[in-house]
Swiss-Prot record:
UniProt entry keywords in alphabetical sequence: Cytoplasm, Glycosidase, Hydrolase
Reaction equation(s) it catalyzes: alpha,alpha-trehalose + H2O = alpha-D-glucose + beta-D-glucose
Catalytic machinery residues: 326 (proton donor/acceptor), 509 (proton donor/acceptor)
Residues binding substrate: 168, 175-176, 212, 221-223, 292-294, 324, 525
Gene of this entry: treF
Assembly information from the UniProt record: Monomer.
Gene Ontology molecular function terms on file: alpha,alpha-trehalase activity
Pathway where it operates: Glycan degradation; trehalose degradation; D-glucose from alpha,alpha-trehalose: step 1/1
Protein name: Cytoplasmic trehalase
Family the entry assigns: Belongs to the glycosyl hydrolase 37 family.
InterPro entries in the cross-refs: 6-hairpin_glycosidase_sf (IPR008928), 6hp_glycosidase-like_sf (IPR012341), Cyt_trehalase (IPR023715), Glyco_hydro_37 (IPR001661), Glyco_hydro_37_CS (IPR018232)
Enzyme class: hydrolase
Pfam families registered for this protein in UniProt: Trehalase (PF01204)
EC number per UniProt: 3.2.1.28
Length: 549
């Protein structure tokens, strides 16, 4: 189970000192009930008894030793290693030999683990291939089969084939996959769409939610809930009928709304926040408050410089990863200082728009099945959420949606996340028109739209542009009749990706688009990744709509 712990042998030489100088934020002391507003969530039910341990829990002090000494340049490498024998035997062997004078940690790891495979060279195209041909030829390279799973690895077995993003990401990711699916549909790969539909439904059935990705260390959180959008895509492309997924949609909704009924005003539990007027809105959350397995050392270092209890920082870092925007000024109290992260204190506009879509989808499919009471219930939930979003997250003075800091009771930053309400049909036409003006003046560039207008060094900020944001902006504005802006973003983005492709013969995770010639996007915790799943998916779909750039 997720919370299972073993007692490691004490190890003075592996201790990491953390100097704590706790800061006091007066705004966070305003109400006594806020101090106890977040009871510890119960353990997630329904996880399989075997192979659900994270590498950190399974290898204990060996894991800390490897990560704290930075044995691998990328902290994700060791959690993705697969053991060559029973993990308990490996741990016992480690405890026997680790204090020997000639102990070699690297040799020990290489003798006992299979290292992750690197396939980066395969993402580079034949220069003679068109952009469309390059993407279509990448799908087999990015496909993983169920039989590739090794016992006791952190990789969670899935029943069907799936697409990975590429680079360091050798597993499937929840919200990435939706944007990848757009391209699969355009490429005529209904076979892979069906496989991925079955996989995500299977994860909901077995885990009660769709994890961040199919790794044990991702089970404690999800990602932006886009399964309702996937179901809509399956229906549109004739892959699977929407009716078969009604129960899965309800299960996902229950995961996101767990604990809502028992919340008092100004209280939060897991993903749900009860606002001062009694309305319910959601935030990102992770059930663990330890360093992320895949970014262990980075998280420990960030917590060191935060001036807050480490477990609070770890929770906010994990919640930031659950948002898909890891990381961004959206979650920071002090722009440019990751240690100031407060993800769990923000009500995100994109998350609540996606949940509005989920509520609407449940209502619509229930109507198709003749379940009138369920339809009425979820239409009301969607209506209530839209009203709450308009009350707390719509900035009428500036004509845009913004995240909301529920602790401080004030609006937070404006970002490209504000276009998600348009993508899911949550806004009215006046809001869409006003938002278009703000996006034009603050986010639009000759290369597409930037994630934010703030340059912080984080990857989900200026100057970077990301494929999913372009797609939702293009379709969102066109949905409300602003074809001119939608088309401009589409042409700008296709020009960006094609320019880079013509020079480097590959697609990448993100692009620097704030001015001048488009180039590789930077920032964040890891090097730029090639591949790249959702870039391929969005660009392939846009080529189908607009032709080759």
């Amino acid at each position: 189970m997720l919370n299972q712990k073993l007692n490691p042998t004490p190890s003075e030489d592996l201790t990491i000192d953390v100097d704590l100088f706790y800061e006091t934020d007066p705004c966070e002391l305003k109400l006594d009930e806020m101090i106890e507003a977040e009871p510890e969530p119960e353990m997630i039910e329904g996880l399989p008894a075997s192979d659900a341990l994270t590498p950190a829990d399974r290898y204990l002090e060996l894991f800390e030793h490897v990560q704290s000494t930075k044995l691998f340049p990328d902290s994700k490498t060791f959690p993705d290693c697969a053991p060559k024998m029973d993990p308990l035997d490996i741990l016992i062997r480690y405890r026997k030999v680790r204090r020997h004078r000639d102990f070699d940690l690297r040799r020990f790891v290489e003798n006992h683990f299979w290292l992750p495979e690197t396939l980066s060279s395969e993402y580079v195209s034949n220069p003679e291939n068109s952009l469309k041909e390059h993407i279509d030829q990448l799908w087999p390279i990015l496909t993983r089969e169920p039989q590739d799973h090794i016992p006791w690895s952190s990789l969670l077995a899935l029943p069907q084939s799936y697409i990975v993003p590429g680079g360091r990401f050798s597993e499937t990711y929840y919200w990435d996959s939706y944007f990848t699916m757009l391209g699969l549909a355009e490429s005529g790969r209904e076979d892979l769409l069906k496989c991925m539909a079955d996989n995500f439904a299977w994860m909901i059935e077995n885990y009660g939610h769709i994890p961040n990705g199919n790794r044990t260390y991702y089970l404690s959180r999800s990602q932006p809930p886009v399964f309702a959008l996937m179901v809509e895509l399956f229906e549109e492309d004739g892959v699977r009928g929407a009716r078969r997924y009604l129960d899965h949609l309800k299960m996902e909704y229950a995961f996101w709304m767990d604990g809502a009924e028992s919340l008092a005003l100004n209280q939060a539990y897991r993903h749900v926040v009860r606002m001062p007027d009694g309305s319910l809105l959601n935030r990102y959350w992770d059930d663990r408050d330890t360093p992320r397995d895949e970014s262990w050392l980075e998280d420990v270092e960030t917590a060191k410089h935060s001036g807050r209890p480490p477990n609070e920082v770890y929770r906010d870092l994990r919640a930031g990863a659950a948002s898909g925007w890891d990381y961004s000024s959206r979650w920071l109290r002090d722009a440019g200082r990751l240690a100031s992260i407060r993800t769990t204190q923000f009500i995100p506009i994109d998350l609540n728009a996606f949940l509005y879509k989920l509520e609407s989808a449940i209502a619509n499919i229930s109507a198709l099945k003749g379940e009138r009471d369920t339809e009425a219930l979820f239409r009301q939930k969607a209506s209530d959420r839209r009203a709450a979003v308009n009350h707390y997250l719509w900035d009428d003075e500036n004509g845009c949606y913004r995240d909301y800091d529920w602790r401080r009771e004030e609006m937070a930053l404006f970002s490209a996340a504000s276009i998600v309400p348009l993508y899911v049909g949550m806004a009215n036409h006046e809001q869409a028109d006003r938002l278009a003006n703000v996006v034009r003046s603050r986010l639009l560039t000759p290369g597409g739209i930037m994630a934010t207008e703030y340059e912080t060094g984080e990857q989900w900020d200026k100057p970077n542009g990301w494929a999913p944001l372009q797609w939702m902006a293009i379709q969102g504005f066109k949905r409300y009749g602003d074809d001119m802006l939608g088309d401009e973003i589409a042409h700008n983005w296709l020009k960006t990706v094609n320019h880079f492709y013509q020079e480097h013969h590959k697609l990448i995770e993100k692009y620097h688009i704030s001015g001048g010639t488009p180039r590789e996007g930077g920032g964040g915790e890891y090097p730029l990744q090639d591949g790249f799943g959702w870039t391929n998916g969005v660009v392939r779909r846009l080529i189908g709509l607009y032709g080759e750039p």
